[in-house]
């Protein structure tokens, strides 16, 4: 069905968050029109990690089984000291973990998640997808939202959901706060398994923590590839953005770590470079018939691997808020915001703190290692209950 005004809901952005939002609307029978600025379908990036909360959200969106077919189910997670190669922390994510949180922990190629969502969108007759359509101007009345794209086209909707990322045009129009450039740079690459060191081909996300830097690797696509994510504190004044990376630059930041993890930096044929950013959490991101979702609402650093996970949660919560509000957008958007602000702010701030833990040096490194080495898996599970224990039936609980 269309909205009571005979107009679709406009969604700015066709990434994971935008597609998930469209599916949430589709499951309510609400027509949606996705405005994606890219001329082609697809997601940049490489591997991502999906916690139990992400799988709960995928199930609620009707794509859980499809996503599971592409995922690699890991056996544990490890944090290693990149200087002396000792294991700092070990957390099993097998059967005990699954029983605790109701879903698995897995790694997956970002493009595979996007593809599953996009295929489901194409199968949903109430969703229209427009490429090469960049939001340029937004106006809101009591009855509708009007979007002008960068080619002068006009799109009228009953509501607008901004899913347009860290540098959201929708957020700029209604909030206008600055991006917080972290000074941390992330390099990402995918390496074929045949070229990856045999002793590091583990069925686990493994992080090597060094001073002001760390590396993460884990398998993708049935173990045929390995994802490599490398983070360091830049010596330069950075501006948020994505570019091609330089092997010389990335290797120059890891001279102080052990040879075993450092060898990984020589493997990729090419790198992509992200100068990362987040924003300060805000208490309001719904404005009448306009709301924000995913990175547009709560951009976060990568240290908790929750960017995609929280966007999926957002979409499900938005659908639940619409159900509880009889598809009346203004109260539904307020209810959705009320249910998400505190939780997502906690993730944003916790991700920053986890970056400090990963990159500890000097005495802080020694304290971190001593605190975590003797920690039992159950204590890690308890500490992560607030994050991984998210449930759809509690989505509207603030």
Residue ranges and their predicted role:
Residues 2-9, 26, 51-173, 177-192, ...:
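Conserved N-terminal helical subregion
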Residues 6, 10-39, 161-162, 187, ...:
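Conserved mid-domain beta->alpha element of the FAD-binding
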Residues 40-56:
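Conserved N-terminal glycine-rich FAD pyrophosphate-binding loop of Rossmann-like flavoproteins
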Residues 181-184, 201-204, 259-275:
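A short coil-to-beta-strand element that immediately follows conserved catalytic motifs
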Residues 193-200, 237, 324:
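Short helix-loop capping/hinge motifs at secondary-structure junctions, enriched
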Residues 203-238, 247, 254, 276:
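Active-site substrate-recognition segment that forms the wall
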Residues 241-272, 329-330:
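Flavin-binding catalytic cores
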Residues 373-398:
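C-terminal auxiliary extensions adjacent to catalytic cores
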């Amino acid at each position: 069905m269309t909205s009571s005004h005979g107009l679709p809901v406009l969604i700015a952005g066709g990434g994971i968050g935008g597609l998930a939002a469209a599916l949430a609307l589709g499951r309510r029978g609400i027509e949606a029109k996705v405005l994606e600025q890219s001329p082609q379908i697809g997601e940049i990036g490489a591997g991502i990690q999906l916690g139990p909360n992400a799988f709960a959200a995928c199930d609620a969106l009707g794509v859980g089984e499809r996503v599971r077919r592409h995922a690699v189910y890991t056996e544990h997670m490890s944090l290693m000291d990149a200087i002396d190669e000792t294991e700092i922390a070990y957390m099993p994510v097998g059967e005990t973990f699954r029983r605790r949180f109701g879903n698995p922990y897995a790694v997956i190629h970002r493009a595979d998640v996007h593809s599953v969502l996009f295929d489901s969108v194409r199968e949903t007759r109430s969703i229209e997808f427009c490429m090469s359509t960049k939001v340029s101007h937004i106006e809101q009345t009591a009855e509708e939202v009007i979007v002008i794209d960068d080619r002068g086209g006009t799109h009228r909707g009953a509501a607008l959901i901004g899913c347009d990322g860290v540098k959201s045009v929708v957020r700029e129009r209604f909030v206008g706060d600055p991006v917080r450039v972290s000074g941390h740079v992330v390099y990402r690459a995918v390496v074929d398994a045949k070229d990856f060191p045999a002793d590091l081909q583990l069925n686990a996300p493994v992080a090597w923590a060094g001073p002001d830097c760390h590396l993460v690797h884990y398998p993708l696509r049935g173990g045929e590839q390995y994802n490599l994510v490398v983070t360091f504190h830049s010596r330069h004044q950075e501006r948020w953005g994505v570019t091609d990376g330089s092997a010389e630059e990335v290797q120059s930041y890891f001279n102080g770590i052990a040879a075993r993890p450092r060898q990984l930096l020589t493997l990729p044929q090419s790198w992509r470079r992200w100068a990362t950013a987040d924003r300060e959490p805000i208490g309001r991101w719904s404005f009448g018939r306009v709301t924000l979702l995913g990175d547009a609402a709560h951009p976060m650093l990568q240290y908790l691997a929750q960017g995609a996970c929280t966007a999926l949660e957002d979409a499900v919560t938005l659908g639940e808020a619409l159900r509880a509000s009889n598809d009346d957008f203004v109260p539904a958007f307020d209810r959705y915001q009320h249910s998400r602000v505190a939780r997502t702010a906690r993730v944003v701030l916790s991700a920053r703190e986890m970056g400090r833990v990963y990159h500890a040096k000097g005495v802080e490194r020694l304290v971190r290692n001593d605190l975590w080495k003797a920690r039992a898996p159950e204590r890690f599970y308890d500490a992560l209950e607030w994050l991984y224990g998210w449930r759809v039936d509690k989505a509207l609980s603030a």
